Structures are given as C-alpha cells and as structure tokens.
Amino acid sequence: MSESLHALARQLEQAIRASQPFQQLKQAYEDVRRDETAYQMFANFRDIQLRLHEKQMRGAAILPDEIEQAQKAMALAQQNAKLARLMALEQQMSMTIAEVQQIAMKPLEELHRSLMEEK
C-alpha cells in the first residue's frame, strides 16, 4: 500500500514539475542566474536567511541588528524586478504546495476529529 502512495507522490512531483507555475518559477530562477546583480543580491539575501534559520534551529537568539539586516536585504531584493518576480512566483508555488499538503492531510485530520467527537 505504501508503495502505491509513493508512486502517487512521484506522479504529483512530475505534475508539479510540468505545471505552468513551476515552469515560470524555473524561468525566473534562470533569469536571476543570468543577471549578475540580481544573482549577487539573491545570494546575499539567501545567506542571511540561512544564517538566521540556523540560529533559530539551534535555539539561539536572533539579534535586532540581524533582523534589520535581513529586512534591508529583503527590501533591496524587492527593488530588483527579476528578484521581485522570482519571490512572487515562489510564494505562489509555496501556497499551491501548502494547499496540496492540506488535501493530503485531510484523512488524518478527519481521524483526529472523529476521535474527539466520539468522546
């Protein structure tokens, strides 16, 4: 049974890869990769984001100046048309995947709800 679920998951992966939103996102990444300025801004923003995430995962405090640095990098990145497009497309794709995840989790949620309703 789990093999069939994995097969369906692989089909979903292929459907995502073939979808227009994913293809647009892929093109946006390529556009950023080809633009040195946009690429450097993206790399800087991503580095800051990763450092903050690592600190958060370790339970370390994120300092106000680190938050400010991240906000400035984000604001700067959003001023670049290619990066702004990439971020918007990435957000749309994330929302779509979150919706798919909600659908996939529905059976578990129904089980939890039914358990609570029985008592």
Curated annotation (Swiss-Prot):
Record Pfam families: Com_YlbF (PF06133)
InterPro entries the UniProt entry points to: Com_YlbF (IPR010368), YheA/YmcA-like_dom_sf (IPR023378)
Family per similarity comment: Belongs to the UPF0342 family.
HAMAP family from the UniProt entry: UPF0342
Protein name as catalogued: UPF0342 protein GTNG_0551
Species name: Geobacillus thermodenitrificans (strain NG80-2)
